[in-house]
């Protein structure tokens, strides 16, 4: 069984760092299935390709300059306090609007349910009335003639019947 991952990692040391051997254990599986599973999990780790990693030269700096702390700490407190108050107020407002929207939706669905029940009751009433009318008019309806379909017997069936009669 091969313990080295796919060629996306450049060296065996990197594969050991990415997945120590104790973590990838597939007991009860065939070697082929274990290898495929290991390749999948190593490929799914989403490490960047070596070509896409940033390389810093000695003269380049890719970091932004660090902000220096301000000398007075009192303005910071007044700056941050309104932010927290506004945030809590906005949370309250959003919570209230959510409650209002939920109550409106609930009212809307209750109205729909009430209308649905009314429609179902109306349909039941109409059905009962229709059944009563049919029962009242049933004795007065003319009785239809029962048409007996003529049996069409094919020649092969006739021959079969004649053969059966001949056997008796």
Curated annotation (Swiss-Prot):
A GO CC annotation recorded here is: cilium
Q: Which organism is it from?
A: Bos taurus
Alphabetical GO biological process terms: axoneme assembly; cilium assembly; flagellated sperm motility; spermatogenesis
Question: Which UniProt keywords are present, listed alphabetically?
Answer: Cell projection, Cytoplasm
Q: What does this protein do?
A: Required for motile ciliogenesis and flagellar genesis by mediating the maturation of the glycolytic enzyme ENO4.
List the taxonomic lineage: Eukaryota, Metazoa, Chordata, Craniata, Vertebrata
Compartments reported by the entry = Cytoplasm; Cell projection, Cilium
Q: Which residues cross the membrane?
A: none
**What family classification does the UniProt entry report for this protein?**
Belongs to the HOATZ family.
Annotated region Disordered: the residues are 142-168
Q: Kindly provide the name given to this protein in its UniProt entry.
A: Cilia- and flagella-associated protein HOATZ
Keyword flag rRNA-binding: no
Basic residues: bias regions: 142-151
Q: Name one Pfam family in it.
A: HOATZ-like
């Amino acid at each position: 069984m091969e313990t080295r991952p796919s060629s996306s990692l450049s060296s065996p040391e990197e594969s050991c760092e990415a997945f120590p051997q104790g973590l990838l254990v597939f007991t009860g599986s065939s070697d082929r299935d274990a290898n495929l599973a290991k390749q999948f999990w190593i490929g799914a780790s989403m490490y960047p390709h070596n070509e896409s990693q940033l390389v810093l030269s000695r003269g380049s700096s890719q970091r932004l300059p660090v902000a220096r702390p301000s000398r007075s700490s009192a303005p910071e407190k007044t700056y941050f306090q309104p932010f927290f108050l506004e945030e809590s107020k906005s949370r309250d407002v959003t919570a209230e609007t959510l409650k209002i929207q939920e109550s409106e939706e609930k009212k809307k669905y209750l109205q729909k349910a009430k209308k649905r029940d009314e429609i179902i009751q109306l349909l039941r009433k109409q059905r009962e009335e229709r059944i009563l009318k049919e029962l009242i008019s049933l004795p007065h309806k003319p009785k239809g003639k029962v048409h007996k379909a003529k049996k069409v017997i094919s020649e092969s069936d006739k021959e079969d019947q004649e053969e059966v009669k001949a056997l008796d």
